[in-house]
Design a protein with these regions (language model features):
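Conserved ABC ATPase signature
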Residues: 61-65, 69
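Catalytic Walker B motif of ABC-type/P-loop ATPase nucleotide-binding domains
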Residues: 86-90
């Protein structure tokens, strides 16, 4: 199963003083033939750390990193697994705006290039609209809409789910939808 799907948890408590490289290497566990890492395992770990921008932290302890750096390490661990399906819980959590856009754009490009499917739970609607070609809108666990952003992210659906007004517009620079939650007029 681990070869089929990789999971990025919302948070991970690491009780051992693992280095970044050691933690990312745990993503390769499902590929190990015996106890020792292969050259392919080391290559996959290095590539995943480079993609996630954490290669410079390889020998640092995971617990010494900032929350955003830890997030990128966990993304690298999921990528090192080389699964065909990535299940990502809040992949942009604790990342600043530029890191979030770069990471999500990189993941979307990788998905298109390598045929990897990505399912991501995201609360930042605008980040989702920036990179997702399909979105699912949930209301207390029930599916309210599934389809293209244009089909799903409509004013009334957003208002019903989040119980506030929204402005739904189109970015003139990139043509993508964006949403702005608004205080209801009094």
């Amino acid at each position: 199963a681990a070869r089929l799907a990789a999971f990025l948890p919302a948070a991970l408590h690491v009780g051992f003083p693992l280095t970044v490289r050691e933690l990312v290497s745990l993503g390769r566990t499902c590929h190990l033939a015996g106890v020792f890492e292969s050259a392919r395992d080391r290559e996959s770990v290095a590539s995943a750390m480079e993609f996630s921008g954490v290669a410079q932290f390889a020998d640092r302890r995971y617990t010494e990193l900032s929350a955003g750096e830890q997030r990128r390490v966990l993304i690298a661990r999921a990528l090192a697994q080389e699964s065909r399906l990535l299940l990502l819980d809040e992949p942009a959590a604790n990342l600043d705006a530029s890191q979030a856009v770069r990471m999500l754009d990189g993941l979307a490009s990788m998905a298109r290039r390598d045929g990897v499917s990505i399912v991501a739970a995201m609360h930042d609607l605008n980040l989702a609209l920036l990179v997702c070609d399909r979105v699912m809108l949930l209301n207390q666990g029930a599916v309210v809409g599934f389809g293209t952003p244009e089909e799903v992210m409509r004013y009334q659906a957003l208002k019903d789910v989040f119980r506030c007004d929204f402005y739904v517009g189109r970015n003139e620079l990139n043509g993508r939808l964006f949403v702005v939650p608004m205080k209801s007029p009094e």
